[in-house]
Amino acid sequence: MTRLVCTANHGFAPYALEELRRLFPRASFRLIVPGEVFELSAEEGREEVLGKINASEPIFLRHIQPVDRALPITGGADDLAALAAVVRDLSDTFRGRRTAVHIRRKEGTPFPHAVADAKAAADAALREIGAEPAMQSPERILSVFADEEELLIGAGTAEEMLSDWPGGAVRF
């Protein structure tokens, strides 16, 4: 089973969702941020899902984040320690690579930490395992989305995620 956090331009999530529904008719979807962010759960494996999405060149879907781990949010300092532990657990993914960290939060999430604090905790864990935190030209991206219950954590390349900007933000 594959889980993805999917992002569209504000107001275009229904169209992005339809693009994915055509590719994965048996998938289930959960709204995270109305009109913009939703979660896809598909029966297919990660490589198959990412391959189909990239091959279809979606118009309305601007960013996808694989969910490799989902941690319950406790609302305390333990959340940052748990995030760092996941980074260390995924050391084979990041070791020796330039790695960007993207942190996004749903409005009203119980995750109490500032984006900068979460990024600092992840960057410190990356350094511990021999990865190089990077802002530009990353080889890998660690993405974290704090929703109403969980930290959704995943890793991939910019190509797999459709963008090297957090949530596929539009560049100006």
Regions picked out by a protein language model, each given a short descriptive name:
Residues 2-129:
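Non-catalytic nucleic-acid substrate-recognition regions in nucleic-acid-modifying enzymes
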Residues 39-41, 145, 154-156:
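Beta-strand residues in well-ordered beta-sheet regions across diverse protein folds
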Residues 68-78, 135-140, 167-172:
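Hydrophobic transmembrane alpha-helix bundles
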Residues 97-99, 131, 138-143, 149-153:
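Generic beta-strand structural signal
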Residues 120-124, 134-136, 149, 156-159:
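Extended, charged alpha/beta regions that create polyanion-binding interfaces
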Residues 149-172:
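Glycine-rich adenosyl-nucleotide cofactor-binding module
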